[in-house]
Amino acid sequence: LSLYRPGPMEHIPTYIRRHHGLEPVSYSEFPHAEKYLKPILDETYGIPVYQEQIMQIASAVAGYSLGEADLLRRCLAEGSLVLDAATGQRVPIEKVRPGMEVFSLGPDYRLYRVPVLEVLESGVREVVRLRTRSGRTLVLTPDHPLLTPEGWKPLCDLPLGTPIAVPAELPVAGHLAPPEERVTLLALLLGDGNTKLSGRRGTRPNAFFYSKDPELLAAYRRCAEALGAKVKAYVHPTTGVVTLATLAPRPGAQDPVKRLVVEAGMVAKAEEKRVPEEVFRYRREALALFLGRLFSTDGSVEKKRISYSSASLGLAQDVAHLLLRLGITSQLRSRGPRAHEVLISGREDILRFAELIGPYLLGAKRERLAALEAEARRRLPGQGWHLRLVLPAVAYRVSEDSSAVSGSAGE
C-alpha cells in the first residue's frame, strides 16, 4: 500500500493541525489496535506517512512477515477492470467491494472463485503501462508481480520479450438467457448498425441496419418484427446496400427497436461502440449466439485465420474478452485510431470457434468457416502462429504474448 506524504490527501489537514499542536493525536477510530499503532505512528502524529509504516502495521496487527506485507504495496491503476466471478460483469477496481467474488490463481495453477475480504486504496503512485505482443494492456505499479516460466517476477525486472502467463480461459458464466431475437438484434446493430444520436438537437437515437447479405437482412427483419416493429427497406441505387429502418407499430407508440438500443446503452458513434453490459452476464449459449451474429457482420473468415474489425478499440477489447470466456484466445492489432482487429489464428482456437460459435454464423461466412475448420484439422496439434505452454488455467504465450513495457506516470 502506498500513500501520499503525509498519508492520503484527506489526512493532510489533520497532519498539519497535529504537527502544530492544534489537535491531539488520537487512535479512537481503532481502539483495539492502539497498542500496535502507537509505537509505529507516534513520530508521524498517528497518521501513516511511509510505506515502511504500513508494512510494520500489517506485520504487527495481522501477523504478516515484512516480506508478505511488502506485497500490499503492489496495486493496479484506477479504472482497471476486475471480473466479477459470480455474474460475469467487469467492475472498475475502485468499485470493488468486500463480498464480491473474484478469481484467484491457486498453487495448482487453477483459477478459483474467492470472496474479496477487504479493499485497500493506495493513493497516488507511479505506474507503468504494460503492452503485450498479443495486444493486451495493463496499468500497474512497477513492483507488481507477473507469472513467468521462471515463477513470479516483478514487472520492473522483466526485459522486453519475456513471456508472461495469461488465462487460457475465463471460467465464468452469467445467468441471463434473453430471447434469441433480442440477442440477434443487439449483435447485428452493434456490428453493422447506426445507433448514434440524430435530429436537429442530436437527441433522437437511430436504429438503422445496413447489409447486402440476404440472410442477415432476413434475420434482422424477423427479429425486429418479433419485437413488434414495422420494417422498411431502402436500396442504394449504386452500391446495392440495403438499409432496414424500423417504425413504431402504430401512431403514438414507441419504436421497440429504438427502445432496445436505449435500454442496452448502445447509443454511440462507431468509434465509441462497446458491447452492451448485459452481454457480460449472458449464459454461455447466449454468449456464443451473440458472438456468432456479431462475427456475421464485421467478422472475416480468411484462409488461415478468423478476424473481427472495428473502428472502436473498446469494442475490439470487449470481443477479445468474450472470446476468452469460451476458451478462445486471440490477438488484438491496431493499425490506427479507427482500425482495430481481433485475430484468431491458433489451431485449437479455430476449432473451438467453429464448434461453439460457428453454428450461429449467418451468410457466406458459415461456408468459409467449414473450409477453414477442415484445414485446421489437417494441422498438427500446436502447429500455428504461436506456441502455448499450457497449465491447467493459464497459458504462456511464447511468441504472440511476449511482453513489451512502456513507462508512464499516472494514478
Locations of the language-model features?
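Alpha-helix capping and helix-loop boundary segments enriched in small/acidic/polar residues
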Residues: Y27-H32, Y45, T87-I93, W152, ...
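Long, charge-dense accessory insertions within large macromolecular proteins
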Residues: L76-L117
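Short acidic, glycine/serine/threonine-rich loops at helix termini
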Residues: P8-T14, D70, S80-L81, E126-R129, ...
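Conserved helix-loop functional segments at active or binding sites
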Residues: G63-Y64, L81-D84, G88, S104, ...
